[in-house]
Amino acid sequence: MGKTLAEKVWEAHIVRRGEGYEPDLLYIDLHLVHEVTSPQAFEGLRLAGRQVRRPDLTLATEDHNVPTTGIDLPIADPVSRTQVDTLRRNCEEFGIRLHPMGDAEQGIVHVVGPQLGLTQPGTTVVCGDSHTSTHGAFGALAFGIGTSEVEHVLATQTLPLRPFKTMAINIEGTLRPGVTSKDVILAVIAKIGTGGGQGYVLEYRGSAVEKMSMEARMTMCNMSIEAGARAGMIAPDETTFAYLQGRPHAPEGTEWDAAVEYWKTLRTDEDAEFDAEVTLDADELTPFVTWGTNPGQGLPLGARIPDPAAIADESERFATEKALDYMGLEAGTPLREVAVDTVFLGSCTNGRIEDLRAAADVLKGRKVASEVRMLVVPGSMRVRKQAEAEGLNEVFTAAGAEWRSAGCSMCLGMNPDQLTPGERSASTSNRNFEGRQGKGGRTHLVSPLVAAATAVRGTLSSPEDLD
């Protein structure tokens, strides 16, 4: 029997195969580190008298806690400042490359890895962060790990793991204008639920996926965890190779040729069997937004807020009632009539140059509504520099948006960019949990196109609503 893409990468990295109920011992090719989940791991090494086994396969960047304004000033919050300072000391002591605030390559860890060419097909990638699945867009087996596992990888460059199940997400057809990969993944999560992918590696396949850019693919894989999955993957192809060629850490010359020949073998075999399969028709998809407090509570933008009274399942009805109460929404309200206070464009989901270009195209010649605040936060300093070279920052500021430095920003309430209680946002990030963007904040997950149109109209909107 043939093997799936995930199985091929897994098999290639087994250091020791587990017997019986024992896990396999897997080699890790790339370990990404940031300031939040690493302090205890480094302290564990220190207490045990251990060194980092492969500092050359480890990269650190400051992203979660960093401010996106006044980056030349000391960090005001004492906890955030301590975590950033601790990362700097740990990286210096253990010989790990670090991209600190203000560095030309600093940014969100899942934006930095791919843009440097560190994320490559057929590799294993881990990070103490849920959205490590982003890197699966390259055909890498990439997943988030906990702090104790971070320490294990630092010490041994391996992880003991049991094989994951595999699920095919087949997306056939052609996306309509105005529909993006963010809409696709929100539709996938709405279809299978936030627990539908639990224990699985999701492989996104089909003609619609093949037509996507690498940045669009990263958006989809990024949110695999929101369906409960361990990872998301896409088989590498010419689009992948074109993105990687010439990047700082990509192979060169004959090594590039050899790498591409190997990468071309990283496709699911025709006779391979998935443990589960799901199919979506890309032709039928429209812009998607979330209305509730988990990424699975999403609907097409043209829909209305659901009515709990119409839901037969008691637990689902209760969850809907609870979400609507927190979100301050009334059943039956058209989503297009939901007004927002803030629009956030950024994050490891949608903070890349392609995302900024898409939003800028919508905002060009238009103004952000007077009652709306819009934050535009590039995913990395490299993205910021490129955007400024293209004049995108001028489009944003002319429209009335704020142009910031790189960081996780308003994706999570760990830095100064937060919502206030009751404040409502349209956000291109990945999670809409209660308090995710700040205590009492209300989050609607959207694509960059919907974010830009919403900023102009002041209510959840798509670009077609501006015509």
Curated annotation (Swiss-Prot):
Question: Which GO biological process categories is it annotated with?
Answer: L-leucine biosynthetic process
Cofactor binding remark: Binds 1 [4Fe-4S] cluster per subunit.
Give one Pfam family, short name only: Aconitase
Q: According to its UniProt record, in which pathway does this protein act? A: Amino-acid biosynthesis; L-leucine biosynthesis; L-leucine from 3-methyl-2-oxobutanoate: step 2/4
Q: Which cofactor does it need?
A: [4Fe-4S] cluster
Q: Which InterPro entries match?
A: 3-IsopropMal_deHydase_lsu (IPR004430), Acnase/IPM_dHydase_lsu_aba_1/3 (IPR015931), Acoase/IPM_deHydtase_lsu_aba (IPR001030), Aconitase_4Fe-4S_BS (IPR018136), Aconitase_4Fe-4S_dom (IPR036008), IPM_dehydratase_rel_enz (IPR050067), IPMI_cat (IPR033941)
- Entry GO MF terms: 3-isopropylmalate dehydratase activity; 4 iron, 4 sulfur cluster binding; metal ion binding
- List every stretch annotated Disordered: 417-445
- Coiled-coil annotated residue ranges, if any: none
> Could you tell me the keywords of this UniProt record?
4Fe-4S, Amino-acid biosynthesis, Branched-chain amino acid biosynthesis, Iron, Iron-sulfur, Leucine biosynthesis, Lyase, Metal-binding
Q: Which reaction(s) does the protein catalyse, per the Swiss-Prot or TrEMBL entry?
A: (2R,3S)-3-isopropylmalate = (2S)-2-isopropylmalate
Q: Where does [4Fe-4S] cluster bind?
A: C348, C408, C411
Tell me its EC number(s), please. Answer: 4.2.1.33
Does the entry annotate any disulfide bonds, and if so which pairs?
Answer: none
- SUPFAM superfamilies attached here? Aconitase iron-sulfur domain
Which major enzyme category is it?
lyase
Please report which protein family the annotation says this sequence is part of: Belongs to the aconitase/IPM isomerase family. LeuC type 1 subfamily.
Q: Give a short account of what the protein does.
A: Catalyzes the isomerization between 2-isopropylmalate and 3-isopropylmalate, via the formation of 2-isopropylmaleate.
- Indicate the quaternary assembly: Heterodimer of LeuC and LeuD.
Which protein are we looking at? 3-isopropylmalate dehydratase large subunit
Gene expressing this chain? leuC
